[in-house]
Amino acid sequence: MKEEILIKFGNKIRQERLKQNLSQEAFADKIGIHRTYIGMIERAEKNITLLNIKKLADGLGISVSDFMKLE
């Protein structure tokens, strides 16, 4: 069973990425993470590190604290 926080986090990434009209591939290239890894995060299949959370937030142009406000 997937953890709820991972689901919310993945949804937040997808939502913010789509707001910027970025494909998974374009976003992955922008931040230096493999496209399949982005997909796994968005599908709540990965529990990622703080360093990668920072990369995601920076790539989306938002602060880590705002990024972590999960609803």
Residue spans for each PLM region:
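Short C-terminal boundary/hinge segments that cap the last helix of small helical domains
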Residues: 61-71
